[in-house]
């Protein structure tokens, strides 16, 4: 059975954000603006996305 995945895209700049939020975005594998990362759909990843929901967009 294939693993469920989720794609996230960084849509807002990290300038002026909290250090913990920058670390969370980095943990999601996002570096530059508009970069996309495909991750396994786990509760931990969902929590990270929820924490920085104002910076990222789920695209798939």
Swiss-Prot record:
> What SUPFAM superfamilies is this protein classified in?
Ribosomal protein L30p/L7e
GO MF term (any one): structural constituent of ribosome
Q: Has keyword Magnesium?
A: no
**Keywords of this entry:** Ribonucleoprotein, Ribosomal protein
Q: Which residues form a coiled coil?
A: none
* Cross-referenced InterPro entries: Ribo_uL30_ferredoxin-like_sf, Ribosomal_uL30_bac-type, Ribosomal_uL30_ferredoxin-like
Single biological process term from Gene Ontology: translation
Provide the Gene Ontology terms for cellular component.
cytosolic large ribosomal subunit
Q: What's this protein's family per the entry?
A: Belongs to the universal ribosomal protein uL30 family.
Q: How does it assemble?
A: Part of the 50S ribosomal subunit.
The protein's name is Large ribosomal subunit protein uL30
Q: Which gene encodes it?
A: rpmD
């Amino acid at each position: 059975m294939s693993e469920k995945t989720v794609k996230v895209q960084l849509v807002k700049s990290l300038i002026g954000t909290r250090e913990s939020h920058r670390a969370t975005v980095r943990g999601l594998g996002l570096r530059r603006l508009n970069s996309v990362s495909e991750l396994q759909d786990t509760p931990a990843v969902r929590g990270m996305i929820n924490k920085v929901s104002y910076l990222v967009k789920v695209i798939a």
